[in-house]
Amino acid sequence: NNSNSVFDSTQVTFPKLLQKAGYQTAVIGKWHLISDPVGFDFWQVLPGQGVYYNPPMKNAQGMVKTQGYVTDIITDLSLDWISKRDKTKPFVLMCQHKAPHREWEPNIKDLGFDKDRVYPEPPTLFDDFANRAKAVGENDMTLEKTITPKDVKLVRPPQLDAEQAAVWDAYYEPRNAAYQKANLSGKDLVRWRYQRYMHDYLATVKAVDDNVGRLLKYLEAEGLAENTIVIYSADQGFYLGEHGW
């Protein structure tokens, strides 16, 4: 939680129970609980929130360097674990993606995938939350007040290698120069932030879609789909229209 308390790994958790029942267990990707995972035969997780590009990870042996995009890496590790598991035992895998957590940094290969499409603005883009539940207006998650230069890619992520940085700069630098020249303010600035957010967010989600697809196709190809329960859940996203609460 936001107080950064350490998860109590001595308590009963469902991976522990399944492990005791004979399941192979693994967690790969986002963890964000400070304490090391317990109840897993294999784990490799991101320290804290992790980063999108070339993320360091941690497993039972210590820190691990990786190269590439975090959503691809988590999926690659997940597929590798499934393929090497003991096929005589049932298994549970928690494939936990960082994306699309803030700052919504897309896979380099997906930059511009939507060809600068102009996205329709929701009628609630300038909502003042006056007719909403009190908690909605108190949350710090608006395009007007909350967005930072890093959120809208006016700052390049420091984790990029030279090749990744070149692609990043080729995409963002001319668009950022046009933004700086326009010197936007007020509602025009909110509108620009909305378009930038949508392009980045959807490009980031595209990688999740692609990689969930890879995982499902693997289950089908290996004859595991009919006997495997897949649970998909997510908890990320700014207000982009519907927020009645």
Report the location of each language-model feature.
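Formylglycine-dependent sulfatase
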Residues: 1-245
